[in-house]
Amino acid sequence: MARKVRVAAVQLNPDLDTPTGTVDRVITAIADAAAQGAELVVFPETVVPYYPYFSFVQPPMMSGGEHMRLYENAVVVPGPVTDAVSAAARRHGIVVMLGV
């Protein structure tokens, strides 16, 4: 018989000021999902640092600064962001899919 897995799909608002703020929100969401019995926690694409929402509302020539900020805040794998999320997953005994 197939084993059932409880999955949590997380939708959260990133901290647009700092990737660290978003990572804190991700770690809190992991703990909350695990407390509710989730075995797999899934986050949206590019949740860290954040989704380039401005691509839909600004012409490309006006988005250079935001693109540079995304580049500067890009997640390095492995690195501090993946280390923190991995530690939270280990601590709660769950699997995490994080879009970076």
Regions found by a protein language model. Give the residues of each.
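Hydrophobic structural segments
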Residues: 1-100
